[in-house]
Amino acid sequence: MKKKMRLKVLLASTATALLLLSGCQSNQTDQTVATYSGGKVTESSLYKELKQSPTTKTMLANMLIYRALNHAYGKSVSTKTVNDAYDSYKQQYGENFDAFLSQNGFSRSSFKESLRTNFLSEVALKKLKKVSESQLKAAWKTYQPKVTVQHILTSDEDTAKQVISDLAAGKDFAMLAKTDSIDTATKDNGGKISFELNNKTLDATFKDAAYKLKNGDYTQTPVKVTDGYEVIKMINHPAKGTFTSSKKALTASVYAKWSRDSSIMQRVISQVLKNQHVTIKDKDLADALDSYKKLATTN
């Protein structure tokens, strides 16, 4: 099923240009960027203009956040991890991948950087904020174990209803997935996926419907999701187990919940910036990180 886009757009290219132009000024050079009849645009004038843009401070903040995270935790996130995530999106969207990037404001390189930023942020969260025993016990109350299902994603409700009728008539789920599912990432393996309740890429309606199923059962009505309609069959719904045996999964569940909490993640980022002694030298851009600095003083 299609992954929901939750990545921050890092407009690093413009921010990079801003810093490069700033560096040129510090070297007391003022190269010509462009000419026109009667004049020219110099690096210093372009730099001054860029600083007036309302988005420049945001772009600079994003760039500094990425660099601070990468300096602090870069060794914890491998290139393979980023590439695997990138390839997963690429496979999922197929020939529509470039359109997906464009719609979300990414180039291929900036998309990889955003993926890396997400991974780095998760590492920072785990390093700087620990899960307590009481938080684990609270998570245990609503915890559900990892399940494995088959699913068929259709673009319209009528097709999903026909799939359910075909299943009732005894047709094979895996064969129907291959012929009727529009999810190119799973249709050829019978529509099989495994996930936990804290999975961030699946629709809540999908997860809610799946966890209500017993082994061998399938949804009797189409499940409405962001990308269409789902028919879901439960393959393996294990017992909940014990609190002690589930601590690792519970910890992952708490961190997944925290990673979706913008206030928590902002505090984590503010601490990273503080630990990395990030300072903006240009007085016109000096308040670009003020929202994070205020959080750091209350941590």
Swiss-Prot record:
Residues linked to a lipid group, N-palmitoyl cysteine type: 24
GO MF annotations, alphabetized: peptidyl-prolyl cis-trans isomerase activity
Class of enzymatic activity (EC top level): isomerase
Compartment(s): Cell membrane
Domain PpiC positions: 144-236
GO biological process: protein folding
GO annotations of cellular component type: plasma membrane
Alphabetical list of InterPro entries matching this protein: Foldase_PrsA, PPIase_dom_sf, PPIase_PpiC, PPIase_PpiC_CS, PrsA_foldase, Trigger_fact/SurA_dom_sf
Lipid-modified residues, S-diacylglycerol cysteine kind: 24
Lipoprotein listed as a keyword: yes
Family that this chain belongs to: Belongs to the PrsA family.
Job description of the protein: This protein is essential for production of active forms of the serine proteinase located in or secreted from the cell envelope.
HAMAP family registered for this protein in UniProt: Foldase_PrsA
Protein's recorded name: Foldase protein PrsA
Species of the source: Lactococcus lactis subsp. cremoris
